Amino acid sequence: MSAGKIIQIIGAVIDVEFPQNAVPKVYDALKVESGLTLEVQQQLGGGVVRCIALGSSDGLKRGLKVENTGNPISVPVGTKTLGRIMNVLGEPIDEKGEIGAEEYWAIHRAAPSYEEQSNSTELLETGIKVIDLICPFAKGGKVGLFGGAGVGKTVNMMELIRNIAIEHSGYSVFAGVGERTREGNDFYHEMTESNVLDKVSLVYGQMNEPPGNRLRVALTGLTMAEKFRDEGRDVLFFVDNIYRYTLAGTEVSALLGRMPSAVGYQPTLAEEMGVLQERITSTKTGSITSVQAVYVPADDLTDPSPATTFAHLDSTVVLSRNIASLGIYPAVDPLDSTSRQLDPLVVGQEHYDVARGVQGILQRYKELKDIIAILGMDELSEDDKLVVARARKIERFLSQPFFVAEVFTGSPGKYVSLKDTIRGFKGILDGEYDHIPEQAFYMVGSIEEVLEKAKKM
């Protein structure tokens, strides 16, 4: 193991000088005598390497001794990681002792080759009406939850984890990338209460941590998920939030001496996203189904970060502030959300027709809103009045009480099977429930509950 010394410190970026004949390779992990781990990013020539600190650089000084480990960062993988909380280096942060894993894998790995990849069209039922109907998930697919600040990305993700972990008995890996520590804590307790903690590995690099941790923690979580996949399992990989992964790259990019690109993002934005996303894939041995929350800065979906993420996804669930302001949760926009699976060959003709019918009525209602605002409801034709009435029922029926939000709402959570979802919306489209007041459709599960609620009104 060769040794060098620190010659420059600028925030999270540190230059280390080594003997000319023992310069570390890019992505090698270096250990400072204070215990801090660095990751080599660039070789500057003259034996100097530029590194990112994976931890706080407080208290470092020039001249400190640095040793080259000769390998990339390696993290524990396998069943020993289940039920544990780890940091970017795979070290436990839950005060439950050592992980005790038999195997350690490097976090930088090649994506599966073209021959190894598999394509599946099997659907994954989530129990959330709007998602199962409008933007169904594929097993082994990639899903993005897009939304601005405070529209419910994390709550939706927690509900998905709860529903899928209870209904589907596979393992999950959760990577908390630059999110609030409070949410990480809530999440841990939610998993404990639902009795699914022993099926989840948690990897956290939260908001208060240096950019190096936030940049690499997604790869740490992904490496653990890849191990489960390569053992022949179907694994779920949750990332909250993919935007902070991009942001961490932006923070270190300028310090690494790169010119910024559009909106100040790093010039390597598309490549960094591709390196992560191409590894999140299903092979012939097992599958990784990933759900990624994507923060949308200033609700602008054309921002380079969310726009780059769109290209990699099979299903996009767009959360809308307008729908949240109506008090309809989950605030999924049924006209903006899409899925590659919404195809009659995959979901069947009935599901496809009902989903398109729902979107058609909501689109017509959106067009009529301007007329209603200026002239009022009375000026509409009878057909349009019927469209508006049904659209308002559909809007309300797309809401649903969540299990993870029971504490806040006071109403018990509901899991609705895909069969019941299609039957309910088909009934509304066919006019079977035209006589029922729209309030009865708000915050319920299946259509039977609507009829029960209507009787009490």
From Swiss-Prot:
Keywords, ordered alphabetically: ATP synthesis, ATP-binding, Cell inner membrane, Cell membrane, CF(1), Hydrogen ion transport, Ion transport, Membrane, Nucleotide-binding, Translocase, Transport
Compartmental location: Cell inner membrane
An example Gene Ontology CC term for this record: plasma membrane
InterPro entries in alphabetical order: AAA+_ATPase, ATP-synt_VA_C, ATP_synth_F1_bsu, ATPase_a/bsu_AS, ATPase_alpha/beta_chains, ATPase_F1/V1/A1_a/bsu_N, ATPase_F1/V1/A1_a/bsu_N_sf, ATPase_F1/V1/A1_a/bsu_nucl-bd
Position of the signal peptide: none
EC class (word): translocase
Positions contributing to ATP binding: G147, G148, A149, G150, V151, G152, K153, T154
Domain of life: Bacteria
SUPFAM superfamilies: C-terminal domain of alpha and beta subunits of F1 ATP synthase (SSF47917), N-terminal domain of alpha and beta subunits of F1 ATP synthase (SSF50615), P-loop containing nucleoside triphosphate hydrolases (SSF52540)
Listed EC numbers: 7.1.2.2
Membrane topology: Peripheral membrane protein
Any Pfam family matching the protein: ATP-synt_ab
GO molecular function: ATP binding; ATP hydrolysis activity; proton-transporting ATP synthase activity, rotational mechanism
Chemical reaction(s) catalysed: ATP + H2O + 4 H(+)(in) = ADP + phosphate + 5 H(+)(out)
Family matches, as PROSITE patterns: ATPASE_ALPHA_BETA (PS00152)
Family: Belongs to the ATPase alpha/beta chains family.
Function: Produces ATP from ADP in the presence of a proton gradient across the membrane. The catalytic sites are hosted primarily by the beta subunits.
Alphabetized PANTHER family for the sequence: ATP SYNTHASE, ATP SYNTHASE SUBUNIT BETA, MITOCHONDRIAL
Subunit structure: F-type ATPases have 2 components, CF(1) - the catalytic core - and CF(0) - the membrane proton channel. CF(1) has five subunits: alpha(3), beta(3), gamma(1), delta(1), epsilon(1). CF(0) has three main subunits: a(1), b(2) and c(9-12). The alpha and beta chains form an alternating ring which encloses part of the gamma chain. CF(1) is attached to CF(0) by a central stalk formed by the gamma and epsilon chains, while a peripheral stalk is formed by the delta and b chains.
Name this polypeptide is given: ATP synthase subunit beta
The organism's taxonomic lineage, starting at the top: Bacteria, Pseudomonadati, Pseudomonadota, Gammaproteobacteria, Pasteurellales
Name of the gene encoding the protein in the UniProt record: atpD
